[in-house]
Structure formats: C-alpha cells, structure tokens
C-alpha cells in the first residue's frame, strides 16, 4: 500500500520522502511546499489495518476484504473507516487546492505511516506485524517528518477530539507445580489457573477504584479497564498441570497523568495481591506505556478547524474526548499541536462490513482543504 501512496504523491507533484521503517514496512511523506512565511500543517494517517480480513470470523464479510465496492452511496472495504478514508480525503483536499490554483505560505504534508494499531510484541507474538502503538509516527518525527500542527483523521463522527486517553498494558502471573495429572491428587489448589481465580476476583474488586477515581477522569470521561486475555497451560498437553497462568489488563490512563505514576499505581496493586496471596507466586509486568494526548481549546488549529467545519456543515463542530489511542501521543511530544478530526466510524454492518458514506468523505475532504488554507495562510 505504501508503494501505491508513493505513486499517488508523485503523480500529484509532491516532494516525496520514503522512510523504510523496517523490512516490509514504510512511511511515505508527501510535501506540498509553500511560498514561505506561514505555519506548516501535517495530515497524518496510518496504513495498517486492525484486521487482515483473513480471520475466520471476517473472511466471509465482503466489507472486511481489501477490495472496494460501492452500494447505496456508501464505500465498503477493509480499513475504510479506520482510517483509509481519511487518507483519501487528505489526497483529494490537496488535489482540490492544486486544481483551484491556491498557493499557501506554509508547507502542507501528508504522512502515511505504518504501525499505529494498538498492539505490541509479547511472548511468542514477535515481529513487524506486532509492532504498533505509533511505531511508524515515532520513526516519522525523528526523520524529518515534523510540522507546526497536525490533523489526524481518525473516525471522530466529525467531532473535534480535544484529548484522548493513553494505554497501559499489565501482565499479572501466578505460578504452580508442573506435574502429571496422575500425580496431582490433592494439589488442585496449587494449580496456577485455580490460583488465578483468586487474583481475577481481586482485580475485579480493584477495577472500580481505578475507574471511579476522579484523578483518572478527563473531559467528562471516566477511565476504563479491560480484562483482555488469560493464558495458562497447554491445550495440546492437558496431562500436565499449568506451571504459570497470565492475566492481561488494558488500563486506560488520562492524558493528565504521567505514565510513570500510572505504572507505579498498578504495580502497587500487584504487590498488594502478592501480599494477600503469598503462596500464589504472583508477579507483574507493565509492557505498554502509551500516553494520551490533548490540545488546548484556544489553540489556533482548533479555530482554523472550527471555521472550516462551519463553512462546510453550517454549524460549529461538537467536542469530544475518547478513550482510544492515536498517534497524537507521539506527535504532541515532538511539539506538533495535534487534533483528531475525521469522518464517521461507519455504519455498523456485520453482514457487509466496514463502510463510509461517500458524501461524508467529500465534505470531510473540503473541511481539510479549508483548514489548510486557514492554518498555512493563502499566499
């Protein structure tokens, strides 16, 4: 897909920078140079998708395949709502500016990046496929891909997202003996899976204390914790007791809390569990710390986006706070003021799959073009 994006940028007459992040994964940066003297604006979007479409539960759904089709004014296909539709809007916004002969003072760039999806390497899950959480944008900003401001076209229902939560991933483990079933009589309570039952009950007691803590709230939204996975034993060899069982949590952290503080707090909880169940061999590991991001309501980018949205839709856009992660996490830490603003997340259709309304894409592209004029200034 990166190759297709590069070809598109070349056809548009953009200055193109190919960033080979690793084998099989690249960022593509297209730059429309300005006349000088104006702020620069980046449109950032990720090339990777949440799914491949080959998953058994998706393989039969046409809208989750990498083959587009149009039906009833809606465009279907893998990744259209998250967020390949936004990438198309960026391209058409710059094409519209070129067709209209609009020259801007500041540079406008489109950054098509890899490795944004919320996933990471852990255990046997190793390799490029599992390197996410802004891996591409982290490479981008350290290799020349910087601007004064950035619009991220994540699916926000055309709302201006002034901030989003970060994510902390935690592993909690229990241990037990590894013995043959025949010799396990009287030792069921030592089984690491059985021991994890105590831990899970205690974690479920702890979760509301995290979610209800005012310190963990942001912009009217509460924090949230997902009990995401449990791994223990060997399905191919259940003649042995499991020597270790792992529980995995996704703990959402407000952008106002330092990740080091969040890490300290969740590990204190784990230490409490170890003290409560000393025979369980409990240990904890924090293996993702992806901070949230925010932008001030009075930042010039918000004013520029408000004006553009109002011109297209006839009303000021609503505000929102989300608990999903975006590459704003990295961009803001490089001094790039970043806001999430994009299309609908799509009409939920479990039969036909991922989709977006074409008219909505056209209007969003116009908002982006007008926002670029407002930010970068017409020469």
Regions from the PLM with identified roles:
Residues 1, 17, 171-379:
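Metal-dependent amide/peptide-bond hydrolase catalytic core
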Residues 1-59, 244-248, 262-268:
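N-terminal helical capping/dimerization or prosegment-like subdomains
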Residues 22-27, 157, 324-327:
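Short acidic loop-to-helix transition motifs that present clustered carboxylates
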Residues 38-112, 118-120, 352:
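Active-site metal-coordination/substrate-binding segment of hydrolases
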Residues 44-46, 111-113, 151-154, 173, ...:
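Short beta-strand segments
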Residues 54-71, 163-174, 304-308, 339:
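Acidic-glycine-rich active-site phosphate/pyrophosphate-binding loop
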Residues 83-165:
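Acidic/histidine-rich catalytic neighborhood of metal-dependent amide-processing enzymes
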């Amino acid at each position: 897909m990166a190759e297709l994006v590069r070809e598109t940028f070349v056809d548009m007459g953009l200055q193109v920078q190919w960033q080979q992040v690793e084998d099989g994964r690249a960022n593509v940066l297209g730059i429309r140079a300005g006349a000088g003297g104006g702020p620069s604006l980046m449109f950032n979007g990720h090339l990777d998708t949440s799914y491949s479409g080959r998953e058994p539960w998706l393989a039969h759904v046409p809208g989750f395949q990498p083959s587009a089709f149009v039906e009833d004014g809606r465009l279907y296909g893998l990744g259209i709502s998250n967020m390949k539709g936004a990438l198309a809007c960026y391209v058409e916004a710059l094409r519209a500016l070129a067709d209209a002969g609009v020259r801007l003072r500041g540079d406008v760039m489109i950054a098509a990046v890899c490795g944004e999806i919320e996933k990471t390497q852990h255990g046997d899950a190793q390799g490029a496929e599992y390197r996410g959480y802004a891996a591409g944008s982290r490479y981008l900003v350290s290799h020349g891909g910087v601007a004064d401001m950035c619009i991220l076209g994540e699916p926000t229902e055309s709302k201006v997202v002034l901030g989003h939560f970060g994510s902390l991933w935690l592993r909690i483990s229990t241990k037990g003996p590894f013995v043959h079933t025949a010799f396990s009589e009287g030792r069921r309570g030592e089984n690491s899976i059985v021991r994890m039952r105590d831990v899970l009950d205690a974690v479920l007691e702890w979760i509301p204390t995290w979610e209800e803590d005012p310190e963990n709230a942001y912009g009217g939204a509460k924090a949230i914790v997902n009990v995401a996975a449990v791994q223990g034993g060997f399905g191919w060899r259940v003649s042995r007791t499991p020597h270790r069982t792992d529980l995995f949590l996704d703990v959402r952290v407000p952008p106002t809390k330092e990740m080091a503080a969040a890490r300290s707090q969740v590990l204190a909880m784990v230490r409490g569990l170890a003290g409560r169940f000393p025979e369980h061999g409990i240990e904890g590991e924090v293996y993702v710390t992806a901070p949230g991001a925010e932008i001030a309501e009075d930042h010039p980018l918000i004013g520029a986006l408000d004006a553009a949205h109002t011109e297209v839709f006839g009303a000021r856009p609503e505000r929102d706070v989300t608990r999903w992660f975006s590459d704003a996490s990295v961009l803001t830490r490089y001094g790039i003021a970043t806001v999430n603003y994009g299309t609908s997340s799509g009409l939920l259709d479990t039969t036909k799959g991922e989709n977006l309304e074409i008219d909505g894409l056209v209007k969003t592209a116009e908002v982006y073009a007008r926002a670029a004029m407002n930010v970068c200034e017409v020469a």
